[in-house]
Amino acid sequence: MAQSSKYQRKPRSGERKRSQRRLELTEEQKKQFDDLLVRTGLTFENRKLLIQAFTHSSYVNEQRIFSSSDNERLEFLGDAVLELAVSQYLFKTYKNMSEGDMTKLRASIVCEPSLARFAEELQFGKLVLLGKGEEVTGGRTRPALLADVFEAFIGALYMDQGLEPVFMFLARFMYPKIKEGAFTYKMDFKSQLQEFVQRDNRGQIRYLIVQERGPAHDREFVSDVQLNEETIGTGTGRSKKEAEQLAAKQALLALNQKES
């Protein structure tokens, strides 16, 4: 039976005011979001999702907007989407990598410091809508906040357009850094170079110590790495292993630049 209107709870004045409040951007903020889309080459059918990805809970609380307007739910979704996208990339790219190594490498890619760096490179910090308290305590540059925003952005992109645009975005801004060896959780550069060469049947890799210099207590080694007898990288280190690793790193950078 329907409850009599006489006994229905009337909304408090604060609740009514809160429900009517809408998030509105300044012209400068709108321009910053437009600039972001230009830089990333993306479009959003639903711009509200894009803005929500950058809306911190402190801003929602201060502005008395519905709590569902902050980016926490999108962050939750983006975390899962990012794990899937990175997992698929590693699975397809490193065909000889063990499950354990893929797990470690993925963890180094989707961890807070890594995601915060991506957010910084994309200048996400200046777009975040923050409460005054969070602003004065340095929230705009806090790694944890930036990492959350990056995940929320991925979640928003997925909700707006699906997985394929997410893959394309990551292929432009994240995957190249994986190939360059930016995430070396400790899959070493020699292993990465070996994977790279084997993947396309490019030939044989060989390491040569071409020089040793300095006194015994402060020895320095120089290593060349060759692909089919052609030197593709050189490294210098305090041990032969370190020199070979740095040679492999240089070779990876050179090969990736040649392909791009």
UniProtKB/Swiss-Prot annotation:
GO terms for biological process: mRNA processing; regulation of gene expression; rRNA processing; tRNA processing. Homodimer. It is found in: Cytoplasm. Digests double-stranded RNA. Involved in the processing of primary rRNA transcript to yield the immediate precursors to the large and small rRNAs (23S and 16S). Processes some mRNAs, and tRNAs when they are encoded in the rRNA operon. Processes pre-crRNA and tracrRNA of type II CRISPR loci if present in the organism. This is Ribonuclease 3. Residues 188-257 form the DRBM domain. It comes from the Bacteria. The gene is rnc. Its cofactor is Mg(2+). Keywords: Cytoplasm, Endonuclease, Hydrolase, Magnesium, Metal-binding, mRNA processing, Nuclease, RNA-binding, rRNA processing, rRNA-binding, tRNA processing. Its main location: cytoplasm. It is an enzyme of class 3 (hydrolase). It catalyses: Endonucleolytic cleavage to 5'-phosphomonoester. Its EC number is 3.1.26.3. SUPFAM superfamilies: dsRNA-binding domain-like (SSF54768), RNase III domain-like (SSF69065). It comes from Shouchella clausii (strain KSM-K16).
